[in-house]
Amino acid sequence: MKEGQYPPYKASGMAYISFARRQPQLFKVLFMRDRTGEPQPAEDELTRRIIGLIMKNTGLEEQAAYTLHIELWIFIHGIASMLVTGYLNLEETVISTMVTDVYQGLLARKKEETA
């Protein structure tokens, strides 16, 4: 993955997947452990900032932006988890297309719901 290859929001997800591919054992330790008792994403300052940027860039209301982000993050984490467990072995270009398709589909649905 090259710097500037993707828009910033997509780049964060693609970097997460790239990290999983490059460092599968570390990824498992960091992101595939019991998280019981940890703050939920809605309580996290970084998540709140991301939601603000999504709202600004898409025109979505706060709840729709939050749901969009969480749905996308679950999708991204799912791909990364499937890569590190050997369940999937997809090329970056295929993953990029999938991420774009899901983002565009979710965004269109959120905008339709709030229209």
Describe the residue ranges of each PLM region:
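Hydrophobic alpha-helical connector segments
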Residues: 1-22, 62, 72
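A short, mixed-charge helix-start or loop-turn motif at secondary-structure junctions
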Residues: 2, 33-36, 58-61, 88
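Juxtamembrane/interface motifs at transmembrane-helix termini
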Residues: 4, 48-49, 85-89
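Hydrophobic side chains within well-formed alpha-helices
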Residues: 5, 16, 26-27, 46, ...
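Amphipathic alpha-helical packing segments from all-alpha helical-bundle domains
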Residues: 35-59, 66-70, 96-111
